[in-house]
């Protein structure tokens, strides 16, 4: 039965030329399959490689078979022997020595033995190097060293396979689009086709070492094309950290980027890693036999375990160290600083490192606000007749203001390290004291806010706890501007306002003050006789006087004509009543009214904020935010914003009690809540972002970045200032100097969709800038445009189409990051709502120029006469001069100061008038008037569905409101934020691969690329930088290609004028270089889009960008038939010939010429161009003068040229090439000698006068010398292939000579 099956199988099996019988498939390669074969003559097993002839031309096939016949002469224990070749109609069969154990790549598979230990890798690599030494001595470059081409026997002998022929097969394949070799093991010069040499095999050896140690070669986690990109781009492939120093050094030698610096195979055999491991291996073999492998693996795993433990301990120690450092940096002395002290942060950072005890001082500032409330009350409200704390001239006395002096001293002391340490000790001593010292500090800070108070007013309310003096409470406040107290009545209900002065007449007020003074004097007398006096007594005292007068508190109106002496005690009582009304059980109107009155009171008496926060805190107010009533929520948010405004301590307090996530819940899109609430929430978050790094960190920790992303609304015209807030907030986040990498912030923002929003914002800002610029360049200047608006108020009327909801709290200065800190939390949010503002001729300097101009126009258009036109023009002239204002403390130093800024700084105080002098109900009245305008339209009417500005000035599609806004919109502000957005995109483009992958969506890239021809050069440069950064990541290249990046980039090379033209060309060429490198499809696409003329211009003009243009131009010869045709039509061959004089580019240029000729079409236009006398002379002269270090590399391109064109071959031979070839036969390099002999043979076969060639050059004698030298051959290592070629050529010459 068995005999019958065997016989049957024999008859069914294929046989080759009746000599070999094909068996099972044992391998599969790029150019065919490998079968086991049986030699029918002697019974030897062989390996038979079967290659399809489908894409191989007959001429190339003959060359390949000749190469195999030549390689049959090689014989070495560490190479697979070629036994011959057989050709059928469809296939070429290459007969090879059979190596039974297969390849190392198969052995290290996870399901077999897995990765090898270093000791075993040394055994195999040493044999690989010995095989390479032999091949290189014979003039053969392997070109494809890898685990799959290293075969092993059962005795552990290693043999190199698949050398020499793979190269010929690749070159012969007319449909190939790749370079020779397997991507992950290829050397950079092989990928770039800049000259393959023996050193290319050394690079592949290094990759094979990593493959045997880890089971995969370098970059195996990437696709082949990105891997090729990284091989060329990176300085060196990544080397595993766990390797020994010797093997690491071995790999660094293999991975030298410059092939000339790599050692040869013979040198590497003497490397310490190979030498030491060989000795250890011999000892191991003698003592332990085959068990050595298992023990080595165990010891290796133990070492790995110990290493992991050490690493874990190290990481743990680092974390502990970082936690200490972070705690000190976050909670240390820095938290006691005032705003002035930010400049000395570095010095305080040094003092933190000097003392770890500073950690205990963290708790002082925050806790001191809450504790010891009675002390704070007494410091604010108690009475004392001797005024210990403050003398009449405003000078502090030693005992009363010792703490203030110490605080000021600490501020000054922070400028030096030594004094900073003393300050740290003082702070540490105070950290456990929750008494009046910390409270006084917060109080003094609050009192300093109104800068209009006189010098002695600064310390008026900063008495120490023991001082119960109230003289300053009733001292005439003549230095307070008249408008300061007016706004308290702005929020009074209309019913109360109508009552006028009825509750308390002027005389009654004076009587009240007299009674109160008398009662105070009586209490002072009692105090001198030993009775105690505190804030509670003061309150009861005031209530008693008020009860005597039976005053209607609810109907109380603070008349602006009233004497300030009489208002203060009444406000104190009103304050207590209003605070008590902030309960969820109260009615909606009562809560809203109380909040509005408290806001007005806090504006006039900021020190009351300290009382409120200390006595009540934020928790009662937070309870009100749970109310479902939107009016209550909005009013409470306004109150919170007024309290925390410009006070870092209060902001930190609000953060610590959990206000951030609560307020964030109101910052979402308007479909979830009213726009007013969202604006108030935005103002709160803006304060946190711009005040201090601590509040910013808390904001980020509460997932604040997604909230900022949400503020980047698509409708820029409608949400202008909210968009500005988001942009500035993101920059604040990026500039935060903490241990968290900026890349993490980029990833969070990108994950939440910021990139598409940024690009839409970039588009909208660019359109706004263009519209603003057009408005400026119109026939009317800003003065005339404004006055025409004032004269014709109808211009503000809008066409029908919907309106805005009324607002009682708008901010024109909200989110203005480049201005002074907003003075009010209830100014207009953006320019589209400025029309709702009440009339103010005196405009605050912290508003944008746009807002100032517009408000004057709106005032006139809404019935408020401008009685003094001369007031308008000076303001406008100042606005013309006013530069973008600087950042406040804690903000980014982003805006570049324009020339002449300091010269105009004196203008700002002229505009810095009080903006809150008008009653708040003017805002309400104004809002109603705007709503009464028929068909009032939103500015968003000019926006497309994507939120992009589409209108132009004067167009019928734009609303009147937006047209007016755009007319007066400051182009500087829009262009400034346009630049910021472009810089933000650049930050994301510089991030890691994950962030870049978010940026590489098709729609996003397409939108970005379509902006190339719409933006000004500075913004265009930034966008091009983004594209260039993306192109450096191999994972982004496919996405860029799909988005037609090449098509959009190339037109930018046509820019010829401007200061930035060189930088623009640099970014474009660099991006194109990254995109087109290695990839022939992209090279062809670039050629189709007209890149070749630009490249030739850069090359011929000797531009600095030649370094990018030259490789691209040379790659075009390899790209496609179309690209080669374009090259020829634009004179590319002449450029290549001129590059032969360039030592660095000559080899690449010659190879490009050879490729163009090899792929020449039937018209033979390339051949005709090369047959010109100048071209022939250039080629011959180049061969003669080529530097020695490049000589080996130019022989293969010359061989391609003369074998592809017999006419060029003959012309070169008769014009001086033949003597040069024969003269260089004494070259000692075997690779050079072998190629020279091939060149001489090709020239001889096509020479018109072969006998003359033989006689004139004494060719037989030169060949005989080579053969005899080879026979002696000790010092040249026996170059077998050279000998074989010389012998074959000599026989051919002998035949010709005989004939």
Curated annotation (Swiss-Prot):
EC assignment: the record states 2.7.11.1
In this chain, composition skew of type Polar residues spans: 415-432, 488-501
Please note every region of biased composition (Low complexity): 374-385
Q: Where is the Protein kinase domain?
A: 20-274
Answer whether the UniProt record assigns the keyword Phosphoprotein to this protein.
yes
- The UniProt entry annotates HEAT repeats at 25-62, 86-125, 218-256, 532-570, 611-649, 653-694, 698-736, 743-780, 781-820, 868-900, 901-939, 955-994, 998-1036, 1043-1081, 1085-1122, 1125-1164, 1186-1210, 1211-1249, 1279-1299
Q: Where is the signal peptide?
A: none
Q: Which Pfam families match?
A: Pkinase
Record localization: Cytoplasm, Cytoskeleton, Microtubule organizing center; Nucleus, Nucleolus; Cell membrane
Task: Write down the chemical reaction(s) this protein catalyses.
Answer: L-seryl-[protein] + ATP = O-phospho-L-seryl-[protein] + ADP + H(+); L-threonyl-[protein] + ATP = O-phospho-L-threonyl-[protein] + ADP + H(+)
> Which residues does the Swiss-Prot or TrEMBL record annotate as the active site?
144 (proton acceptor)
Q: Where along the chain is ATP bound? A: 26-34, 49
What the record says about family reads:
Belongs to the protein kinase superfamily. Ser/Thr protein kinase family.
Function in brief: Serine/threonine-protein kinase involved in the spatial and temporal control system organizing cortical activities in mitotic and postmitotic cells. Required for the normal functioning of the plasma membrane in developing pollen. Involved in the regulation of cell expansion and embryo development.
The molecule here is called MAP3K epsilon protein kinase 1
Q: Which organism is it from?
A: Brassica napus
């Amino acid at each position: 039965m068995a005999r019958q099956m065997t016989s049957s199988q024999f008859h069914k099996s294929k046989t080759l030329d009746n000599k070999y019988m094909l068996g099972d498939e044992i391998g599969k390669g790029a150019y065919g399959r490998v079968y086991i074969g049986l030699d029918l003559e002697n019974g030897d097993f062989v390996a038979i490689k079967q290659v399809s002839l489908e894409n191989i031309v007959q001429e190339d096939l003959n060359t390949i078979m000749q190469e195999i016949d030549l390689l049959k002469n090689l014989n070495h224990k560490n190479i697979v022997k070629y036994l011959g070749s057989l050709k059928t109609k469809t296939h070429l069969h290459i007969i090879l020595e059979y190596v039974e154990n297969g390849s190392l790549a198969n052995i290290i598979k996870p399901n077999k033995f897995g990765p090898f230990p270093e000791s075993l890798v040394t055994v195999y690599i040493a044999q690989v190097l010995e095989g390479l030494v032999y091949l290189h001595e014979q003039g053969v470059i392997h070109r494809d060293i890898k685990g799959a081409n290293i075969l092993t026997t059962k005795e552990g002998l290693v043999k190199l396979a698949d050398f020499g022929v793979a190269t010929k097969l690749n070159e012969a394949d007319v449909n190939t689009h790749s370079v020779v070799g397997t991507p992950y093991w290829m050397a950079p010069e092989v990928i770039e086709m800049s000259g393959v040499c023996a050193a290319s095999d050394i690079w592949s050896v290094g990759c094979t070492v990593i493959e045997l140690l880890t089971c995969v070669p370098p970059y195996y986690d990437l696709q082949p094309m990105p891997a090729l990109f990284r091989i060329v781009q990176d300085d060196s492939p990544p080397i595993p950290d766990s390797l020994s120093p010797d093997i690491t050094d071995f790999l660094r030698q293999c991975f030298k980027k410059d092939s000339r610096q790599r050692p040869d195979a013979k040198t590497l055999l003497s490397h310490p890693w190979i030498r030491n491991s060989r000795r250890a291996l011999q000892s191991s073999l003698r003592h332990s036999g085959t068990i050595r492998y298992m023990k080595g693996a165990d010891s290796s795993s133990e070492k790995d375990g110990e290493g992991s433990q050490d690493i874990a301990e190290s990481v743990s120690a680092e974390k502990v160290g970082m936690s200490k450092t972070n705690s000190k940096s976050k909670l240390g002395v820095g938290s006691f600083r005032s705003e002035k002290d930010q400049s000395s942060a570095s010095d305080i950072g040094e003092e933190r490192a000097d003392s770890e005890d500073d950690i205990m001082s963290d708790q002082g500032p925050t806790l001191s606000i809450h504790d010891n409330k009675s002390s704070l009350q007494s410091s604010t409200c108690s009475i004392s007749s001797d005024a210990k704390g403050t003398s009449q001239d405003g000078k502090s006395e030693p005992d009363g203001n010792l703490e203030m002096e110490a605080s000021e001293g600490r501020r000054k002391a922070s400028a030096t390290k030594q004094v900073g340490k003393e300050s740290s000790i003082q702070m540490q001593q105070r950290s456990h004291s929750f008494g009046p010292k910390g409270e006084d500090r917060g109080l003094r800070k609050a009192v300093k806010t109104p800068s209009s108070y006189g010098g002695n007013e600064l310390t008026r309310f900063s008495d120490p706890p023991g001082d119960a003096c109230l003289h300053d409470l009733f001292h005439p406040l003549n230095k307070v501007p008249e408008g300061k107290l007016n706004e308290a009545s702005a929020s009074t209900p209309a019913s109360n306002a109508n009552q006028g002065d009825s509750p308390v007449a002027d005389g009654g007020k004076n009587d009240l003050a007299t009674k109160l003074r008398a009662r105070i004097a009586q209490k002072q007398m009692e105090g001198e006789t030993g009775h105690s006096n505190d804030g509670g007594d003061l309150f009861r005292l005031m209530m008693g006087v008020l009860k005597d007068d039976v005053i209607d508190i609810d109907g109380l109106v603070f008349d602006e004509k009233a004497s300030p002496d009489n208002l203060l005690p009444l406000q104190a009582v009103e304050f207590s009543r209003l605070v008590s009304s902030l309960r969820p059980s109260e009615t909606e109107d009562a809560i809203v009214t109380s909040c509005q009155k408290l806001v007005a009171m806090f504006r006039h008496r900021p020190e009351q904020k300290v009382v409120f926060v200390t006595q009540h805190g934020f928790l009662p107010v937070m309870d009100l935010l749970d109310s479902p009533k939107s009016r209550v929520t909005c009013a409470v948010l306004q109150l919170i914003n007024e309290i925390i405004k410009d006070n870092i301590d209060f902001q930190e307090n609000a953060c610590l009690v959990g206000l951030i996530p609560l307020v964030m819940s109101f910052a979402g899109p308007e479909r979830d809540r009213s726009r007013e609430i969202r604006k108030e929430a935005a103002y709160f978050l803006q304060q946190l972002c711009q005040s201090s790094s601590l509040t910013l960190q808390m904001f980020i920790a509460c997932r604040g970045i997604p909230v900022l992303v949400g503020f980047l609304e698509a409708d820029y015209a409608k949400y202008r200032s909210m968009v500005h807030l988001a942009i500035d907030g993101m920059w604040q986040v990026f500039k935060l100097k903490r241990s968290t990498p900026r890349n993490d912030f980029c990833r969070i923002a990108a994950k939440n969709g910021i990139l598409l929003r940024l690009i839409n914002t970039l588009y909208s800002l660019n359109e706004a800038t263009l519209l603003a610029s057009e408005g400026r360049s119109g026939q009317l200047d800003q003065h005339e445009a404004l006055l025409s608006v004032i004269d014709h108020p109808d211009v503000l009327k809008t066409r029908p189409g919907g309106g805005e909801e009324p607002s009682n709290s708008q901010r024109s200065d909200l989110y203005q990051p480049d201005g002074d800190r907003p003075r009010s939390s209830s100014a207009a949010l953006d320019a589209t709502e400025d029309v709702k503002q009440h009339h103010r001729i005196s405009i605050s300097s912290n508003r944008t120029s746009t807002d100032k101009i517009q408000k004057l126009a709106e005032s006139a258009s809404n019935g408020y006469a401008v009685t003094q036109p001369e007031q308008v023009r000076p303001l406008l002239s100042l606005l013309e001069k006013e530069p973008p204002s600087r950042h406040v403390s804690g903000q980014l130093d982003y805006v570049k100061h324009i020339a002449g800024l300091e010269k105009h700084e004196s203008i700002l105080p002229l505009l810095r008038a009080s903006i809150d002098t008008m009653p708040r109900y003017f805002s309400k009245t104004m809002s109603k008037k705007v709503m009464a305008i028929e068909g009032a339209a939103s500015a968003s009417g000019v926006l497309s569905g994507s939120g992009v500005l589409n209108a132009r000035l004067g167009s019928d599609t734009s609303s009147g409101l937006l047209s007016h806004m755009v007319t007066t919109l400051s182009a500087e502000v829009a262009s400034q934020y346009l630049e910021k957005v472009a810089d933000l995109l650049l930050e994301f483009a510089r991030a890691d691969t994950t962030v870049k992958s978010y940026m590489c969506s098709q729609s996003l890239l397409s939108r970005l690329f379509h902006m190339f021809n719409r933006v000004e050069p500075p913004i265009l440069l930034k966008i091009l930088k983004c594209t260039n950064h993306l192109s450096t990541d191999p994972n982004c290249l496919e996405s860029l290609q799909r988005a037609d990046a090449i098509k959009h980039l190339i037109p930018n090379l046509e820019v010829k004028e401007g200061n930035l033209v060189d930088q623009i060309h640099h970014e474009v060429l660099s991006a194109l270089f990254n995109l087109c490198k290695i990839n022939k499809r992209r090279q062809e696409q670039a050629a189709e889009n007209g890149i070749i003329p630009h490249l030739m211009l850069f090359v011929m003009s000797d531009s600095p960008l030649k370094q990018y243009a030259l490789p691209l131009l040379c790659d075009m010869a390899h790209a496609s038939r179309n690209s080669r045709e374009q090259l020829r039509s634009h004179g590319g061959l002449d450029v290549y010939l001129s590059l032969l004089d360039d030592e660095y580019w000559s080899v690449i240029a010659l190879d490009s010429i050879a490729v163009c000729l090899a792929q020449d079409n039937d018209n033979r236009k390339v051949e005709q161009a090369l047959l010109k006398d100048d071209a022939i002379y250039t080629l011959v002269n180049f061969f003669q003068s080529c530097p020695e270090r490049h000589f080996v590399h130019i022989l293969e391109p010359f061989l391609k040229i003369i074998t592809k064109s017999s006419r060029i071959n003959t012309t070169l031979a008769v014009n001086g090439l033949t003597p040069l070839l024969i003269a260089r036969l004494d070259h000692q390099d075997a690779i050079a000698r072998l190629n020279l002999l091939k060149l001489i043979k090709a020239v001889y076969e096509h020479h018109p006068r072969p006998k003359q060639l033989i006689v004139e050059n004494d060719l037989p004698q030169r060949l005989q010398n080579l053969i005899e030298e080879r026979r002696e051959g000790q010092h040249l290592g026996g170059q077998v292939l050279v000998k074989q070629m010389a012998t074959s050529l000599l026989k051919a010459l002998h035949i010709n000579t005989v004939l």
